[in-house]
Curated annotation (Swiss-Prot):
Natural source organism: Streptomyces griseus subsp. griseus (strain JCM 4626 / CBS 651.72 / NBRC 13350 / KCC S-0626 / ISP 5235)
Family, per entry: Belongs to the UppP family.
Top EC class of this enzyme: hydrolase
Catalysed reaction equations from the record: di-trans,octa-cis-undecaprenyl diphosphate + H2O = di-trans,octa-cis-undecaprenyl phosphate + phosphate + H(+)
Enzyme Commission (EC) number: 3.6.1.27
Organismal lineage: Bacteria, Bacillati, Actinomycetota, Actinomycetes, Kitasatosporales
Name of protein: Undecaprenyl-diphosphatase
InterPro entries named among the record's database cross-references: UppP (IPR003824)
Entries under HAMAP family matching the protein: Undec_diphosphatase
Amino acid sequence: MSWFESFVLGLVQGLTEFLPISSSAHLRLTAAFAGWHDPGAAFTAISQIGTEAAVLIYFRKDIARILSAWFRSLTDRSMRGDHDAQMGWLVIVGSIPIGVLGITLKDQIEGPFRDLRLIATTLIVMGIVLGVADRLAARDETGGKHRVVKERKTLKDLGVKDGLIYGFCQAMALIPGVSRSGATISGGLLMGYTRESAARYSFLLAIPAVLASGAYELKDVGEGHVSWGPTIFATLVAFFVGYAVIAWFMKFITTKSFMPFVIYRILLGVVLFILIWAGVLSPHAGESAG
């Protein structure tokens, strides 16, 4: 991998990680369109450490408060009913599905799941799901045709059941094209959470999974066509770009609809199918044994 490739891929990772359009799919597609090697699951996982570092800094006050309350709850029973302490436990509970499935499906994640036909399918299907979830949220917020505004849930209403559902939604993102934020935000909206609450828990929930996955994949850096230098460079680029994107996105969702992302996902999936059908792109473009 050249330094230019690592810069472009780091830029793509930073731009797309927090948007509900799938960063792993865009890394895969960028390499395929450019005629580069597929960066692979290891590069994707490690570059995501950069964007998760952006989450750690952006939500540093929330995270510090949650960690402090969670650690105190281990020895102080009176803290176990504290909202922040419970949030710490719910992030752990919500991380279980992706941990189990990530280990179980490792071979599929690094192979069949990177087929461009599957990516096109998930882009379209999950785009439709996000669109439905967005419309339901908008109906509650505006009252729909009957003008009956429904109060949506916040993170104070989050329990173990909803936390696990969020977790399984996150696990779906092991398939490129699904989108970690897209799946978890869609799940949150369908369960009745506000846009801001759904996005906030989505980003907090991703921290353990992404950091663990990136740490696990460190052993594969230096093998094949991905070396340490370009990988670290891409991770740094992803961090700086990702921080700017998450700051913008958290403001965007308070007043705007997710429909632009829905339309983009569906159009990208359709175009990808057309290019594959026309023979312009191979479903396995960029894949190699190294």
